[in-house]
Amino acid sequence: MGHTQAKSTTDRRVEGGELLLQHLAGRMIPPEFSGPITTAGKFPTIQHVMDHIDSVEELRTLQAGGHWPEGTARRLGLDQPRPTPPPITWTEEEDKKAKEFFKQYQENRPKPAETAPPPITELHAAEPPQWKISPEDPLLKAKALIPVKEPEVPILKVPKLTNKKKMGATFGGILAGLIGLLVGFFLLTKILEILRKLDWWWISLSSPKEKMLCAFQNTGAQTSPHYVGSCPWGCPGFLWTYLRLFIIFLLLLLVAAGLLFLTENKSTIFEKLQWESVSALSSSIYSLLPSEPKSLVALTFGLFLIWTTSSSVTQVLVTLTQLATLSALFFKNSG
């Protein structure tokens, strides 16, 4: 394939002028005309003539403005309506003369007078006015021109309310009494249960399993066969059972009193029982306890609820937790 030469700007202008002339000529000649096309057309009407005059005026306007001169000349049959002027060239002598003239002009050019800038005067900040007023100033002693009247506020006397007995206080006292009775009955039941378990453990250590039946069940009133420690009402062993429970309760009180005595005196015997480990355990439990009394009551009540609805193993764990909590509270109050 051959390479086509790139069109110059002049050629592009010529083509643009021809396209413009064709567009203007299309306005003079109707599109259905199939005869030879000339500048004036064939068999022109008065409308064609007027369009031709308008087109020629537009061409003259474009030619006068210098737009597409070569394309306009080719369309109208003119060779060179405006010959291009020859390019201006400089000879070496003229170039040297121009450079020398410019050099002399720069040397002989008068220099602008250098004027020193005016000195800047130092501006000092004005001293702030003194707004202090002495106590003897007459402005302080002068009275206001407009008298100030205090607004009169009506005083409303509120009648005293008579102290009426509310039903809520009475109901609250009754409810508190019922809750106290419920808690006391619950504690009594749990204490008896713990004492019976200790009694059963004591009897199991002292007698074999074959002799666990009550020995008094055939001596008194006719009762069904039962074990020692669970004697019903009417059996002679009933009193002995509660006597043993009372003795166990006294022993527990004695042990508690001894512990209190040892903790108050901090004797050497209690120190041998690893006082530091016990105090560390109690302090760790105390750090986990809530500080508010309501939270402590809620915690204790929750432990009691777990006790009532759990198995024997869980009851043992809850009992140990309760004892640890009570001991921590005791050490807190004593410390």
From Swiss-Prot:
<keyword id="KW-1168">Fusion of virus membrane with host membrane</keyword>
<feature type="topological domain" description="Extracellular; in external conformation">
    <location>
        <begin position="2"/>
        <end position="167"/>
    </location>
</feature>
<keyword id="KW-1161">Viral attachment to host cell</keyword>
<feature type="transmembrane region" description="Helical; Name=TM2">
    <location>
        <begin position="242"/>
        <end position="262"/>
    </location>
</feature>
<keyword id="KW-1160">Virus entry into host cell</keyword>
<keyword id="KW-0946">Virion</keyword>
<feature type="topological domain" description="Cytoplasmic; in external conformation">
    <location>
        <begin position="189"/>
        <end position="241"/>
    </location>
</feature>
<dbReference type="GO" id="GO:0019031">
    <property type="term" value="C:viral envelope"/>
</dbReference>
<feature type="topological domain" description="Cytoplasmic">
    <location>
        <begin position="317"/>
        <end position="335"/>
    </location>
</feature>
<dbReference type="GO" id="GO:0046718">
    <property type="term" value="P:symbiont entry into host cell"/>
</dbReference>
<protein>
    <recommendedName>
        <fullName>Large envelope protein</fullName>
    </recommendedName>
</protein>
<dbReference type="InterPro" id="IPR000349">
    <property type="entry name" value="HBV_HBSAG"/>
</dbReference>
<dbReference type="GO" id="GO:0055036">
    <property type="term" value="C:virion membrane"/>
</dbReference>
<feature type="lipid moiety-binding region" description="N-myristoyl glycine; by host">
    <location>
        <position position="2"/>
    </location>
</feature>
<feature type="region of interest" description="Pre-S">
    <location>
        <begin position="2"/>
        <end position="166"/>
    </location>
</feature>
<feature type="topological domain" description="Extracellular">
    <location>
        <begin position="263"/>
        <end position="295"/>
    </location>
</feature>
<keyword id="KW-0519">Myristate</keyword>
<keyword id="KW-0261">Viral envelope protein</keyword>
<keyword id="KW-0325">Glycoprotein</keyword>
<feature type="site" description="Cleavage; by host">
    <location>
        <begin position="243"/>
        <end position="244"/>
    </location>
</feature>
<comment type="subunit">
    <text>Large internal envelope protein interacts with capsid protein.</text>
</comment>
<comment type="function">
    <text>The large envelope protein exists in two topological conformations, one which is termed 'external' or Le-HBsAg and the other 'internal' or Li-HBsAg. In its external conformation the protein attaches the virus to cell receptors and thereby initiating infection. This interaction determines the species specificity and liver tropism. The large envelope protein probably also assumes fusion between virion and host membranes. In its internal conformation the protein plays a role in virion morphogenesis and mediates the contact with the nucleocapsid like a matrix protein.</text>
</comment>
<feature type="glycosylation site" description="N-linked (GlcNAc...) asparagine; by host">
    <location>
        <position position="265"/>
    </location>
</feature>
<keyword id="KW-0449">Lipoprotein</keyword>
<dbReference type="GO" id="GO:0039663">
    <property type="term" value="P:membrane fusion involved in viral entry into host cell"/>
</dbReference>
<dbReference type="Pfam" id="PF00695">
    <property type="entry name" value="vMSA"/>
</dbReference>
<feature type="transmembrane region" description="Helical; Name=TM3">
    <location>
        <begin position="296"/>
        <end position="316"/>
    </location>
</feature>
<dbReference type="GO" id="GO:0016020">
    <property type="term" value="C:membrane"/>
</dbReference>
<keyword id="KW-0812">Transmembrane</keyword>
<keyword id="KW-1133">Transmembrane helix</keyword>
<feature type="transmembrane region" description="Helical; Name=TM1; Note=In internal conformation">
    <location>
        <begin position="168"/>
        <end position="188"/>
    </location>
</feature>
<keyword id="KW-0945">Host-virus interaction</keyword>
<keyword id="KW-1162">Viral penetration into host cytoplasm</keyword>
<feature type="topological domain" description="Cytoplasmic; in internal conformation">
    <location>
        <begin position="2"/>
        <end position="241"/>
    </location>
</feature>
<comment type="function">
    <text>Truncated S protein may be involved in translocation of pre-S domain through the virion membrane.</text>
</comment>
<keyword id="KW-0472">Membrane</keyword>
<dbReference type="GO" id="GO:0019062">
    <property type="term" value="P:virion attachment to host cell"/>
</dbReference>
<comment type="similarity">
    <text>Belongs to the avihepadnavirus major surface antigen family.</text>
</comment>
<keyword id="KW-0597">Phosphoprotein</keyword>
<feature type="region of interest" description="Disordered">
    <location>
        <begin position="68"/>
        <end position="90"/>
    </location>
</feature>
